[in-house]
């Protein structure tokens, strides 16, 4: 008999296999959250969605909130990084505002049905979504102020900046809520929403030169009646 006895049963997981299981749990959490929000999120639903045993779940997470926080981390990072990247270009005025708006819409497009519970809980202090929203907004505010300072433009007042960001949030919520469950908003709705967002952002964060320039762009503002 050898000095060591061979281990019985299945071989230990590799690091790659462990990461795959962990990712599977996080993905399942996102899918359950999309249907139920945080109020209906439970370990039982997550393991059913992931097709794993309860002991497997607890090998990676202590409760249903832990994988949800990873979902929210990824969501925040996607929005903040998307806006940060959009504002790194040497753009001015109108183009800068449009890039900010397109970053919001690109972020929303990647969330699908998750947008409904995400936006429904944005202003609920009891939901972890609310705290994540505030952290994301703080980072976005700092990014916008830094860009305005870099361009030598007056820094927007806190109220103007929040008005612009909250309108972007609200419009994205409206178009996501109008879509059928499990589907994306139709392109016409998104295009109309984009124009609404551009108008509001220009009015709150722009100056007279920006508005005059935007007046010449097709489709941004309706022509005055003749």
Indicate where each model-derived feature is located:
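Amphipathic alpha-helical segments used for helix-helix packing
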Residues: 108-127, 145, 173-181
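Amphipathic alpha-helical linker/stalk segments
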Residues: 35, 71-99, 115, 144-150
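Amphipathic alpha-helical packing segments from all-alpha helical-bundle domains
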Residues: 77-80, 107, 127-152, 158-166, ...
């Amino acid at each position: 008999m050898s000095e060591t006895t061979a281990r019985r049963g299945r071989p230990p997981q590799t690091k790659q296999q462990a990461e795959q299981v962990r990712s599977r749990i996080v993905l399942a959490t996102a899918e359950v959250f999309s249907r139920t929000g945080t109020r209906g999120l439970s370990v039982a639903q997550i393991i059913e969605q992931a097709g794993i045993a309860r002991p497997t779940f607890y090998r990676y997470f202590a409760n249903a909130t832990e994988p949800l926080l990873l979902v929210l981390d990824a969501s925040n990072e996607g929005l903040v990084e998307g806006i940060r990247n959009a504002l790194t270009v040497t753009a001015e005025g109108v183009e800068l505002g449009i890039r900010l708006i397109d970053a919001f819409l690109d972020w929303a497009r990647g969330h699908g049905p998750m947008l409904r519970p995400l936006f429904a809980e944005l202003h609920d202090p009891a939901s972890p979504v609310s705290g994540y929203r505030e952290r994301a907004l703080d980072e976005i505010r700092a990014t916008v102020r830094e860009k305005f300072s870099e361009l030598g433009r007056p820094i927007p007042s806190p109220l103007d900046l929040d008005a612009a960001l909250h309108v972007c949030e609200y419009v994205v919520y409206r178009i996501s809520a109008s879509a059928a469950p499990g589907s994306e908003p139709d392109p016409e709705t998104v295009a109309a929403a984009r124009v609404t967002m551009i108008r509001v952002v220009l009015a709150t964060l722009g100056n007279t030169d920006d508005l005059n320039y935007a007046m010449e762009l097709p489709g941004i503002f309706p022509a005055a009646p003749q």
